[in-house]
């Protein structure tokens, strides 16, 4: 009897933990461009960090063309969430920024690490928040930064290694996610008020098109209604932006 009660409690807890969330996928429709190899010959330490070819991460899809590295966030949610105490970690590994794209809440710490045995330079290209530009030698202690204002996606680069780039979006809330290698995303909506919200989708290859039409314009958003349960947002399709006439 006791075992049965424990089983029911564990099962109930598992179901409860899975409830308040938004889940979905992102897929590309069109011809997939050939992946480009990165040339790291300028710094031998970078090349020696890899035993296999390294490819540009600006456009990654799997065999079914589900897209990796799409940032998904909720537009202007009604929430009571505090700034997370855990920092967002940005590392430099094998002369690449990890992760390639990320979100962060305004006021939340960004912890920057250098796991490489070479010098890097961290140069933010923000247009709203204060920029930073500093060197980070090998074996440096982590550096921490934060952003005081919301900001559309911008990139951070390394002036020493021009192929290194990571993208950041600064939000007034923690409700964001990045698609994985199979195009999946999941947003925990535990502290959101029930209602209908817009999900915004962003990818760096569409950045110029989005600036023209506006971030979170009709083409790059999906409306979802949430409650105390898991919500399937379906599959968001990205098509190649039409060329301007």
Where are these regions (language model features)?
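Short, Lys/Arg-enriched, disordered terminal segments
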Residues: 1-5, 245
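Extracytoplasmic copper-binding redox domains, predominantly the cupredoxin/blue-copper superfamily
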Residues: 18-245
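Sec-dependent N-terminal signal peptides
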Residues: 4-13
């Amino acid at each position: 009897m006791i075992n049965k009660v424990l089983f029911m409690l564990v099962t109930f807890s598992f179901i409860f933990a899975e409830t308040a969330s938004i889940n979905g996928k992102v897929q590309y429709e069109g011809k997939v461009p050939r992946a480009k190899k990165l040339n790291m010959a300028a710094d031998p330490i970078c090349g020696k960090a890899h035993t296999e070819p390294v490819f540009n991460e600006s456009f990654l899809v799997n065999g079914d063309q589900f897209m990796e590295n799409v940032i998904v966030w909720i537009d202007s949610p009604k929430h009571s969430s505090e700034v997370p105490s855990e920092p967002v970690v940005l590392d430099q590994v094998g002369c690449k920024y990890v992760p390639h794209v990320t979100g962060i809440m305004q006021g939340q710490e960004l912890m920057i690490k250098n796991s490489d045995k070479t010098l890097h330079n961290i140069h933010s290209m923000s247009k709203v928040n204060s920029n930073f530009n500093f060197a980070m030698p090998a074996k440096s202690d982590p550096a921490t930064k934060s952003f005081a204002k919301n900001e559309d996606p911008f990139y951070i680069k390394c002036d020493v290694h021009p192929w290194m780039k990571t993208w950041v979006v600064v939000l007034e809330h923690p409700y964001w996610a990045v698609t994985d290698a199979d195009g999946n995303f999941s947003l925990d909506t535990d502290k959101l008020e029930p209602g209908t919200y817009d999900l915004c989708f962003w990818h760096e290859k569409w950045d110029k098109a989005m600036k023209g039409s506006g971030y979170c314009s009709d083409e790059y958003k999906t409306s979802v209604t949430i409650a105390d349960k898991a919500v399937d947002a379906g599959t968001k399709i990205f098509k190649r932006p039409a060329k301007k006439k």
